[in-house]
């Protein structure tokens, strides 16, 4: 088994899944949803319909972009990598709803977990048959969508519950909870994990979202001041 996993480049480790995959997911999120939101907002403020359309299309591709980025971080072969676009779309769409059908915030988190499993399953069967071009995409997509249908709504509900609890506590005690949220998100910014991905997965908005932004800004100002001697202007 160890020899098979090594040959398939399947490594079960916290670094690969919690750092490499999560960081790649954040990049995929930025290159789709976040940049799309920025462009769309510019279009709305400047009354440029083209930018609004561009932003809408970019935001709509957040699921596939995150899944493909995760597959790239896991060093998935081409057929697995391309198949993850479908998996990401399904996981993001189903993770954005709860079991009751209401809106959920677990799209990015669902994409992360499901894309990892689908990618590793695809890697396991890749180039094992003479009809690899059929088997590998089929396994990757079927496993991914099956897990998306099974897990994603629950992930969406759980992420929404956690995010809502944080936002409720922040509204109840804005000073102390604002400090806690800003410090924790700021610390996440300094670690090899993605603060943007965490906040997106929990759907933080309102005071909690503002506290997270303040924490990140404070950390970046601190980095700039501490490294000014080495980096200059």
Give each language-model segment a name.
Residues 1-233:
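Pore-lining transmembrane helices
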């Amino acid at each position: 088994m160890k020899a098979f996993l090594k040959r398939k480049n399947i490594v079960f480790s916290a670094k690969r899944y919690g750092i490499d995959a999560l960081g790649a997911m954040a990049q995929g999120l930025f290159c789709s949803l976040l940049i799309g939101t920025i462009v769309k907002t510019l279009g709305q403020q400047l009354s440029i319909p083209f930018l609004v359309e561009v932003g809408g299309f970019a935001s709509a591709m957040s699921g596939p972009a995150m899944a493909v980025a995760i597959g790239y971080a896991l060093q998935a072969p081409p057929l697995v990598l391309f198949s993850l676009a479908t998996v990401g779309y399904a996981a993001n769409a189903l993770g954005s709803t709860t079991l009751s059908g209401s809106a959920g915030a677990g799209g990015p988190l669902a994409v992360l977990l499901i894309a990892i499993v689908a990618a590793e399953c695809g890697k396991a069967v890749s180039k094992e048959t003479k009809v690899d071009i059929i088997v590998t995409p089929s396994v990757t997509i079927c496993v991914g969508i099956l897990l998306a249908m099974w897990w994603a709504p629950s992930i969406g509900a759980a992420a929404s519950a956690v995010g809502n609890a944080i936002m409720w506590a922040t509204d109840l005690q804005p000073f102390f909870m604002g400090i806690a949220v800003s410090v924790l998100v700021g610390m996440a910014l300094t670690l090899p994990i993605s603060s943007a991905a965490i906040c997106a997965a929990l759907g933080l908005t309102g005071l909690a979202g503002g506290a997270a932004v303040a924490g990140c800004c404070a950390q970046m100002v601190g980095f700039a001041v501490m490294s000014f001697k080495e980096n200059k202007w």
